């Protein structure tokens, strides 16, 4: 046993469970690639100020959860707690918004880090797939992203998730609501820290998950009652487009999410099988974020879906993903000449796209066949001195148990035909 263990709140992805995570990532990415989204990858750490400005200085993410550190050169950096700010920074730095058609549509996948109290569904290191559409203010774009996320989940076989939808208004109508909410919050029995948060960003209080706080928020003013005509019309079009696409959703007037940059459309995907950590993903529109981090006005929208929580949701529903075997053919050599010849055949099989593995370590027939069984291979190729003297190998169908002799020079073509 190793002296070292994974740090608290983190995990290692190892086979066979890692295959589930790869399948989830691919299921989320596939409809994005099919809808004009290009892949982007950003560093695992950024300037602290990027997140302080973008995510919000009063958010729990920035004040309590960020892994921040100072380099030997004096730079203040942080492990990325979310993906949107990094992707927008990269797009601005590369001038993608000047290169051609808007919106710039990007998708990404990676690990993110937050210093949180570890529990099921909430880790200090977690995996997400995200999508961002940068540089266009269009209800159809908001609807597109919600529909694509719904499509991703359903392609995995997930059914018992809900989509919560709200509008946070814009810079014209939200200040009026903000003032009304602050007046309401000042009359509640809240602790000093929460009252301070209410003065900086009162919407953060609506996102407080503590039961004693939520009980007092029953009569809080609702943002939908303060939306200006433009925001009402925008939100109604998003709702109509989603409905026309056959995607079900629930209006949630108290949905604000945990990041300060959201404007207008905000949404969350929740699964009741996950207990208190019910959100499996979410996103929204962030029309002012580009300007917050020093860029031009670029209205944008995006989401991030949690790979870890999606896997947990699938398990909660009892969904078994159809995962292809990592090995289709397993070669078992008996003797040095067979070892040389079968190793060459395994290499040929791989070149023509057949997943093949080899019995390494000079194990006997019994031990090698155990490995073949464990590999999940459909076929096993066995060869000994007598077989090679006759110019054949033994091809065994691991499902039926049927075994046939096939010419050494024909085995690759035979397996190609069988695996088709």
From Swiss-Prot:
CDD domains: HisRS-like_core (cd00773), HisRS_anticodon (cd00859). SUPFAM superfamilies: Class II aaRS ABD-related, Class II aaRS and biotin synthetases. It catalyses: tRNA(His) + L-histidine + ATP = L-histidyl-tRNA(His) + AMP + diphosphate + H(+). It is found in: Cytoplasm. GO terms for biological process: histidyl-tRNA aminoacylation. Gene3D superfamilies: Anticodon-binding domain, Bira Bifunctional Protein, Domain 2. Pfam families: HGTP_anticodon, tRNA-synt_His. Keywords: Aminoacyl-tRNA synthetase, ATP-binding, Cytoplasm, Ligase, Nucleotide-binding, Protein biosynthesis. Homodimer. Belongs to the class-II aminoacyl-tRNA synthetase family. This is Histidine--tRNA ligase. It comes from Streptomyces avermitilis (strain ATCC 31267 / DSM 46492 / JCM 5070 / NBRC 14893 / NCIMB 12804 / NRRL 8165 / MA-4680). The lineage of its organism: Bacteria, Bacillati, Actinomycetota, Actinomycetes, Kitasatosporales. The gene is hisS.
């Amino acid at each position: 046993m190793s002296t070292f263990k994974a740090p608290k709140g983190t995990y290692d992805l190892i086979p066979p469970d890692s295959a589930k995570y790869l399948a989830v990532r691919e299921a989320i990415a596939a409809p994005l690639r099919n809808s004009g989204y290009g892949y982007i990858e950003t560093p695992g750490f950024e300037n602290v100020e990027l997140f302080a400005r973008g995510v919000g200085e009063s958010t729990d993410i920035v004040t309590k959860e960020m892994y921040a550190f100072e380099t030997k050169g004096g730079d203040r950096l942080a492990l990325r707690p979310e993906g949107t700010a990094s992707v927008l920074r990269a797009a601005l730095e590369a001038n993608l918004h000047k290169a051609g058609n808007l919106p710039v549509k990007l998708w990404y996948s990676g690990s993110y880090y937050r210093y949180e109290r570890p529990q099921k569904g909430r880790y200090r290191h977690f995996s997400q797939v995200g999508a961002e559409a940068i540089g266009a203010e269009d209800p159809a774009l908001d609807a597109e992203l919600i529909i694509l996320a719904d499509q991703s989940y359903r392609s995995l076989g997930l059914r018992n998730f809900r989509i919560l939808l709200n509008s946070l208004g814009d810079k014209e109508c939200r200040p009026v609501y903000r003032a009304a909410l602050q007046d309401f919050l000042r009359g509640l029995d809240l602790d000093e820290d929460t009252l301070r948060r209410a003065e900086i960003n009162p919407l953060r209080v609506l996102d407080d998950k503590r039961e004693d706080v939520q009980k007092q928020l029953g009569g809080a003013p609702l943002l939908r009652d303060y939306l200006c005509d433009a925001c009402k019309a925008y939100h109604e079009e998003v709702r109509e487009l989603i409905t026309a696409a056959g995607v079900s959703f629930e209006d949630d007037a108290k949905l604000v999410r945990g990041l300060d940059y959201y404007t207008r459309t905000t949404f969350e995907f929740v699964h009741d099988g996950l207990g208190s950590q019910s959100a499996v993903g979410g996103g929204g529109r962030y029309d002012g974020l580009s300007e917050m981090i020093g860029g031009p006005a670029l209205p944008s929208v995006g989401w991030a879906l949690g790979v870890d929580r999606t896997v947990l949701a699938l398990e909660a529903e009892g969904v078994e993903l159809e995962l292809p075997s990592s090995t289709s053919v397993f070669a078992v050599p008996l003797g040095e000449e067979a070892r040389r010849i079968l190793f060459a055949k395994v290499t040929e099989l791989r070149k023509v796209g057949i997943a093949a593995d080899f019995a390494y370590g000079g194990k006997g027939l019994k031990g090698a066949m155990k490995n073949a069984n464990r590999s999940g291979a459909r076929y096993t190729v066995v060869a000994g001195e007598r077989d090679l003297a006759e110019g054949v190998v033994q091809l065994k169908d691991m499902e039926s148990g049927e075994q046939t002799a096939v010419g050494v020079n024909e085995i690759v073509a035979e397996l190609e035909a069988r695996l088709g």
